[in-house]
């Protein structure tokens, strides 16, 4: 019998008497082959997948926290597995996803345009609605133009990876969001990490940069994992001192 989570000092130490059998079963599901045919004659990737059963063990223990299906509106209270529970993880701070006006507009847009775009925005997936939205946002924030993305992760992935070149620099906080880190990895620029919210560390990294090269400082506004706020006044001060540009991911 599977031991309860509270009895295990660490998740990876859960005692599963049938652990090996479970792993074999999971491996056979991944490989779409009968358990009887399961053997060691697997390629390295399949073998690696077969050995990784932590998610299945977490599900069996009832502590797997991901991909829980919600069967209700996105409100402060939602229904999961038939139970009404409080939602503390929502990004919908305004509640607009359930605003009757937004719902009606979405219905009308579906009637006119269909249920989705038939291509990427770069080719044939840009609708007049997208351009109208970009124009209204640009007017609202007082900028010449804006570019909208479908996700916040996509913004940082797309922008951070393309703004700078091979001989330029990206300076980033060690607690930056994963999307910033992935965008930095895709860039060909030189990457310099500074200690979390440590302005002395940031300045030392700025001093390492060649003066005539582009320097992009990328930081969260509110750090999503810790909840603390970036020292933007000091970051801007240093950016002016070393002729750098600041990019802020203001997601929260």
Features from the language model and the residues they span:
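Positively charged N-terminal leader segments that act as targeting/secretion signals
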Residues: 4-12
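N-terminal "arm"/small-domain region of PLP-dependent enzymes with the aminotransferase-like
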Residues: 38, 43, 47-115, 244
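Conserved N-terminal alpha-helix of the aminotransferase class I/II PLP-enzyme fold
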Residues: 104, 108-152
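Conserved PLP-anchoring active-site segment centered on the Schiff-base-forming lysine
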Residues: 159-178
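Short, structured coil segments at secondary-structure junctions
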Residues: 166, 186-188, 242
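Active-site phosphate-binding strand-loop segment of PLP-dependent enzymes
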Residues: 192, 196-248
